[in-house]
Amino acid sequence: DLRRVIYFGYHNDDPAQRFRSSLPVGRVLEDPFGMPPVILCYKLNGEFLTPERGGPVRVVVPEAYGFKSIKWLTHLYLSNNHAANDTYAEQNNDVDSPLKTFCETLSVPRSIKANEPFAVTGYAQVGISGLQRVEVSIQNKSVTRDQEQRDDDAENEDSANALDWTAATILPPPKQWGGSLPDNRIPEGTIGFDSSGEPKSWPIRLSKAHWAILLPGLPAGTYVFRSRTVDQNGAVQPMPRPFRNSGRAHVEQVSLEVTS
């Protein structure tokens, strides 16, 4: 009759503020194709997990948002209840939604001289559907207010596709992985990496990748910069799951001032 694993960790001594999460037992016992396993983590890179990171023991659900990876684990129950009792479920969130693919900017010049090239950088979260490319678009804000309102609607796919989109460059894997790894090398047997410690493909699902683009100069004016992802299935952000309660995926918009 086992159907669900329910667990929670220590946050404070108030039972009303208990932070709970749960998983179907099938996800605990078997991994979807290409996905890492659900684990109880007590060490990271050979060192005991610090309290800041959720130690002494933390649940890690690789393809899920953070509320599934409960810190400071204290209780774990096996249940025949089919329904999720997650704390986030009580707040009208989709607790079974896996990570989405989306992108955002990291560095955008707020003031730019007219007709001079400028660079924009950002990162992309690579969800379960992978990442094919990152695209950017610049729109002059002199468009009519009605048209601007249609373009500002991140869920209006027709308006977004009417813009001119240019592919950015997805940067290669880092040469230094950090984390005090021996010889700065990903250990053999790590999911997604070959025997030499190099990624089998890039970007890796359930990771983040950096992107960059050098844009040509623009005439003086006020502009809106947008960036979006296209996943391995060809779905364009915020699709295929544009719902806010299923995780963040809206198309970021940044204002740019180009001065003469």
Report residues per predicted region.
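Extended, aromatic/histidine-rich regions of cofactor-dependent oxidoreductases associated
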Residues: 1-260
